[in-house]
Amino acid sequence: MGSRLHVQEIKKGPPLPFKDDIRAFTREYAESLDAQDPLRHFRDEFIIPSKKDLKRKTLNANENIEDSSDPRSIYLCGNSLGLQPRNTRKYLEHYLRTWAIKGVTGHFTPHDDQLLPPFVDVDDAGAKLMAPIVGALESEVAVMGTLTANLHFLMASFYQPTKEKYKIILEGKAFPSDHYAVESQIQHHNLDPKDAMVLIELENLDRPILDTEKILRVIDEHASSTALILLSGIQFYTGQYFDIEKITAYAHSKGIIIGWDCAHAAGNVELKLHDWNVDFAAWCNYKYLNSGPGGMAGLFVHENHGRVDMTKVGSKDEPFRPRLSGWWGDDKKTRFRMENRFVPQPGAAGFQLSNPSVLDMNAVAASLEIFNRTSMAEIRKKSLDLTGYLEHLLLKYPLDAAPEDKPFSIITPSNPAERGAQLSLRLGPGLLDNVLEVLEENGVVIDERKPDVIRVAPAPLYNTYADVWQFCQIFFDACQKAVRARK
C-alpha cells in the first residue's frame, strides 16, 4: 500500500530526474521539462521546417513558410546542418544594403545601425564572437576558409617532417576529408603514406570506440618518429568525445605537436582550447553553429605559436612561425601599402590569406550572436540532459526484450562525459531503409550512415524534450514495422 501511495505522490508532484520518475515515458513529462528549461526561449530564434515544407516540390518564395497551423518537423540533425537563425536574414540584408549604398567605401565606412563593423574589420568581429565558444583568446581564433582547406594551411605550418620524425598519427576511421588531407600532405613532402601515416584502428568493430589508453599506446609506439598528431574532438560516426586535454598533454610530453578537428565539437561541447594547450584546431561552422551549408569555417592557433618577434623582422632569425601566407594575414598597419614584405599579424589572424567573404561572415555572426547571449557551459548542461533523456527512452524499448533481441543498439559511449549531443544507433540487419521511410513520412529529420547506422543529435538551442519524446514514439513504431517487413 505504501509503495502505491508513493507512486501516486510522484504522479501529483513536479517532475523528478527522468531516471527516477515513472512519468518519464509520457508526453506530459517531456513538456514539463520544457516548461522548466532556462534556454527554451532560444527555440524561437530559429526557423524550424514544417512537415509540409519537407515535402514541398517548389520554393514558393512569396509564400508564408511559418503557417502556425502546419506542424513543425522533428529536426534532430544539427550534427549535419544546423537550422537557420531568424536573424540571418537581417544580417544579410544589412550587408546587402551596405554594399548597395556604399560600394567599395563600405570597407571603411561605419554606420550607426550596423550589425558588424565595416568590411575591412569583419574578421575581427568574427574572432571576438567565436573565441568564447571554443575556449580561446580572441587573438587565437580566425573565422576563415573552409575546414579541409584550413587543415591544409595549418599542416603546412605545423607538419615539418625530418628524417627522424616524419609520421602523422590519426584515427583509422577519421572523416574521409581529414584522411585525404593527411595523406596528401605526406605525399607533398615526397613521403610514402604507407610508412608515414599511422592509423589508430579499432580493436572491436562491434564496439567502435577508441579508448584513451589505446590512443596513448599508439603515441608511445611511434613517439620517436612522429612529427604530428591530428585527431577529431568528437568522432563523426560514433559521437565519441575524446579526452582532448589528456591526449594533448601526453603528446606534448613526448615532444609531439597535436591538432584537433573540432567540426563536431564546436558549439556542441564546452571546449577550452587555450587552457588545454592545444597547438592548433579547425572546425566548420555549419553544424551546431548554424552558419549555413558550406559556411565559412574557423581555426585556432595557440598563442605560443602565433607570436611575432618584431625585433627580428628583417634579420636572418625567423621572427614568426613559417606558414602559407596571404595579404589578409599581413600586419594591418602596412597591409595596404603593398610593399611585398610580409609581416603577419600576431595570432591566428596572421594565418589568414584572402579577405573573408563578408556575405559568409554575416551568416556566421548571425548565429554566434545567439550563442553569445548564453554560454557554452549552459548549452552543454542542457545538452547533457536532453541527450540523456533520449538515451533513457531508447534503452527502455522494448521493455521486455533482451539486448540481443532489440532492433537497435547505441554505439555512442554511455558515459555522458565521453559524448556530445549525438547518439548513433546501429539498426539490425535489413532494417535501415524501412525505418528511414517511416521517419521521413512523419517529418523526422536525422541522417544515416549506411549500411545500418542513424545519427540522432538534439541541439539544445532549438530542440525540446517533447521533440525527443515524439521522435522515440515514431522511431519505435518504425522499428516495429521494419521488423515485420523483414520477416
Curated annotation (Swiss-Prot):
Pathway: Amino-acid degradation; L-kynurenine degradation; L-alanine and anthranilate from L-kynurenine: step 1/1; Cofactor biosynthesis; NAD(+) biosynthesis; quinolinate from L-kynurenine: step 2/3
One example of a Gene Ontology biological process annotation: 'de novo' NAD biosynthetic process from L-tryptophan
Signal peptide location: none
Entry EC number(s): 3.7.1.3
Residue positions, PTM N6-(pyridoxal phosphate)lysine: K287
Family: Belongs to the kynureninase family.
Description of how the protein assembles with itself and partners: Homodimer.
Name of this chain's protein: Kynureninase 1
Species assigned in the record: Aspergillus oryzae (strain ATCC 42149 / RIB 40)
